Amino acid sequence: MGSMLTRLAPLTTTGVGSLPFARPADAVRHAVGAYELPFCPQLPRAYGDMVQEWLGADPGRCGWAPDRDRQLPAAWDDFVLEVIRHPPSVGVVKLQVTGPLTLAVALEGRSSRRCTDMPDLAREIAGWLAAAVSDQVRTLADVGLATLVVVDEPGLMAAQRHGACGGVWDALRAAAPAWGLHVCGEVPWRWLDAAEPDVISYDVMRYGCDRAAQATIRRLMRRGGRVIWGVADAVAPEGPSLIVDRVCAAARAVAGRRWRTADVLDASLLSGTCGTGGSEVAAERRLARDLLLAAHLLRGDPLPAVPSPPRREDEVSVDRDRVADL
């Protein structure tokens, strides 16, 4: 795990999962070209939300249709072709997988008959998901790419109320060189801590970085893991300056008195707060651009050449001065 994650530069940018494009080829070109850690996007406008993409049009049964086993993401073929044509420089890509707990909760909620044991259903789904993910990870390995698998669990708190336990992810943990958890809702930090993922991705804009979060992220860093800060919202873009402020505040909170803020930043990645499948394409492009500018400012890199309206030189100077004060 460690060697793969150490290939990623501090404050590497990535997307969460869904994108607002209708055509897989357009979505994939953006996911590979606009982010430093490319990812295979979900396309809710064309194929339904993250649950429908995996469960299909009839998720109303507590079971698994034959065509769901080893199902590939809708953009998969285009993604593989794109990363072969334009491989990431560090040889790492990300797969975002709808989590077994979220799928189990969805199946239970939509079924005409109640599923009596959601945790058992989630473990069964996890096995099926792991089979599909293992195939995808092997395909990417065959073209020289290592894969970070991030399990997307927006239904985590609901699953916890149903009695689910962290062992549900064991099959997915074993399916990739490194694995993580993304939670766009309220985060049960003790549960995430006990699960010991290699990467934690969450919405720091909405949920902040309280003591429970700080303790969990410190332990994550001691294991050589990474935190993906969800620091920008495509619905209400704020620009790179506020992203820089937000990342620095979270890093200082985790560092406390015993760590260096720079060490926390070294273990950080940047993303939006959630997938942007419900946003406009222009908003997603701006989000990716703002994240990239913020990352370059925080790292002290030369500003990248991105297709965007020119920023005033005084704005850039203010940003650089703020970072220099860390």
Please place each PLM-identified region on the residue numbering:
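A short acidic, amphipathic alpha-helical/loop segment
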Residues: 27, 31, 190-195, 212-220
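A short, acidic, amphipathic alpha-helical segment used as a generic capping/interface helix at domain edges
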Residues: 210-219, 240-263
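Hydrophobic beta-strand scaffold residues
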Residues: 179, 226-228
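Active-site beta-loop-alpha junctions enriched in small/polar residues
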Residues: 98-100, 154-156, 184-188, 205-207, ...
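Non-membrane alpha-helical structural segments and their capping/turn regions in soluble enzymes
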Residues: 25, 69, 73, 119-134, ...
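Surface-exposed amphipathic alpha-helices with a cationic face
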Residues: 80-84, 137-141, 169-176, 221, ...
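Active-site loop segments of alpha/beta catalytic cores
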Residues: 95, 117-209
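Alpha/beta catalytic barrel-like cores
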Residues: 1-118, 198, 225, 239, ...
